[in-house]
Amino acid sequence: MGRWASESRAPGTMRGGAWTAERSEGPHLRTEMMETLLFTDERCLLHETPYSHPESPKRLRKILDSLAAEPVPGTEQATVRPATRDELLLVHEVRHVDAILELRGRSTQLDVDTWLSPGSVDAALLAAGATVEAVRALKEGRARNAFVLVRPPGHHAESNRSMGFCIFNNVALAAAVARKQLGVERILIAGWDFHQGNGTQESFWDRSDVLCFSTHRKPPFYPQTGTLE
């Protein structure tokens, strides 16, 4: 694959609903590794939430439209796949995974602020699978960087429950795959959010090879976790 020219803004093209910046063919810019792979899928928009809910499809739609109108040089969209049940079981309990999968195609409320629409389970599987594939791409040397642009989010989802807009824990799953299947010996997960990633913390609380670093508002504040103690 070719590297993008970084000194000028490249026009974009649409390919099957995906955007890509046009590639420079200058020999001095050729390389075997893509600069940044973008993992996203418009099917993540199928996760619909109630009117005025802060985790809205409009958030992702706005970003995708902006990227289509003004592509970022040095990026290319990668193929996204759903996470498998076996992958989900690396961080989630069987009863939680199976309970969510049984709700595919249905609308329901999982907790006070976490909802499912008919497309939510498929969107959640794609979000988790995209994060796993991003880690694989980096480990295999297919890109220097990866950016995962998906929804629903994941860092509040614990091993046995969905919460805080999150259904499956995308980042925890990717870290588990990296550690158990890709031979990564040490992992740093940096969380930058107003709310602490309680689900990610729970996934690796007893492990010395995964460090979860988080900047967040301290309790008393949702999800009431993340104190210095």
List PLM regions with ranges.
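Short glycine/proline- and acidic residue-enriched helix-loop micro-motifs
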Residues: Q109-D122
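Short, Lys/Arg-enriched N-terminal segments with co-localized hydrophobic residues
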Residues: R23-M33
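Charged, often glycine-rich, active-site loop that binds/positions anionic groups
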Residues: R81-G105
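N-terminal low-complexity, Ser/Thr- and acidic-residue-enriched intrinsically disordered segments
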Residues: M34-E87
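Glycine-rich anion/phosphate-binding loops
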Residues: G119-V132
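Serine residues within intrinsically disordered or low-complexity segments
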Residues: S6-S8, S24
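Conserved alpha-helical scaffold segments that buttress catalytic/binding sites
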Residues: V132, R136, F147-E229
